[in-house]
Amino acid sequence: MYHGNAHRRFGRTHEHRKAMFANMCQALIKHEQIVTTLPKAKDLRPVVEKLVTLGKRGDLHARRQAIAQIKDVALVGKLFAVLGPRYKERHGGYTRVLKAGFRYGDNAPMAVIEFVDRDVDAKGKDSGPVFGADQDEAALAS
């Protein structure tokens, strides 16, 4: 029987699931909108909501709890400096999950999870390492 099991396992170990949600939280805080499968988006939502609530609290203990969860100090800074004040007057419901069709390869239901009053310019900003950028900067400087 499947009684008393609160969360989906996604075919992963506990550590793998925890790391996956930490990475997805980082991506959502950085870009303020991500595309993932519908079950992952539904399970990610309470994790992100708790992080935003920590950002609203704003004290040192909340900051340390957020760092323990997502492990990127720069994104924790954004969480406390941008997202916390943005949702100061809102009591929960910081994210929305929108259905986005089905994935081509395996017909998995896809979803978009985003912050409610998101910054449209944050999407795609600093979306990862740019290979060869060091040579371009050196060429421009000389």
Swiss-Prot record:
Gene giving rise to this polypeptide: rplQ
GO biological process, one term: translation
Oligomeric form and interacting partners: Part of the 50S ribosomal subunit. Contacts protein L32.
Name the UniProt record assigns to this protein: Large ribosomal subunit protein bL17
InterPro entries: Ribosomal_bL17, Ribosomal_bL17_CS, Ribosomal_bL17_sf
HAMAP family: Ribosomal_bL17 (MF_01368)
SUPFAM superfamilies: Prokaryotic ribosomal protein L17
One of the record's GO molecular function terms: structural constituent of ribosome
Protein family according to the UniProt entry: Belongs to the bacterial ribosomal protein bL17 family.
Keyword Ribonucleoprotein on entry: yes
Gene3D superfamilies linked: Ribosomal protein L17 (3.90.1030.10)
Pfam families: Ribosomal_L17
Keywords: Ribonucleoprotein, Ribosomal protein
GO cellular component: cytosolic large ribosomal subunit
The keyword Zinc-finger appears for this protein: no
NCBIfam families according to UniProt: L17
